Amino acid sequence: SGVFLTELVKELAAKGHEQAVVAGVYKEDKTEVPENTKIYPVIFKSEELPFPIAGMSDEMPYESTRYCDMTEEMAGQFANVFLTKIRQAVKEFQPDLILSHHLYLLTALVREHFPELPVYGFCHNTDLRQLQKNVLKQEYIKAQIAKLNRIFALHEEQKTQICQMFHVTAEQVEVSGMGYNSHIF
């Protein structure tokens, strides 16, 4: 999803869209986004968030926290730090809409706390798996995801699964495809 986000930001910038990105990172991470894109980093393994990045898969290619191991205290820290950073981004950047990756906890928080803005969610499949496996705020997540203005699915089968899991209509879900970088492939 990090690659997906980066490529999406690059494509939207090439089409002339102004963007800001809120992303969970480590202090030493380098973010590669177009020059005029404002970054609002949420730093993990810091004083505010003393644990590794919450990974959408149980095994990530970097140090991470599994959602199934996240305590209520950790979930509260996660929510507070991300929401503080997103509020700052919304105040400074004044977006027309918010695009959020993964139909999971952070997207649910965004939907709840920014009701005045259209919020679109991208499904990456790992989010659906996490929701099926973990009880962490499961009903809250389902309720908030159902309120998204638009959901992007990777394919038709996933669209059907999203409609069933979140009780949304087929009209709320758009199949966007997986995407690729044409400069590489």
Which sequence ranges carry the predicted segments?
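Histidine-centered beta-alpha loop that forms part of the nucleotide-sugar donor binding/catalytic region
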Residues: 1, 103, 123-126, 177-178
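Short amphipathic alpha-helix
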Residues: 2-13
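Acidic anion/phosphate-binding donor-loop and adjacent secondary structure
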Residues: 17, 131-133, 163, 171, ...
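A conserved catalytic-core segment of Leloir-type glycosyltransferases
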Residues: 24-92
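Carbohydrate-associated surface elements
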Residues: 25, 157, 179
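Active-site proximal beta-strand in glycosyltransferases
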Residues: 97-100, 110-130
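Short beta-strand scaffold positions
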Residues: 100-101, 153-154, 175
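Membrane-proximal helix-turn-helix segments that form the acceptor-binding/catalytic region
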Residues: 134-151
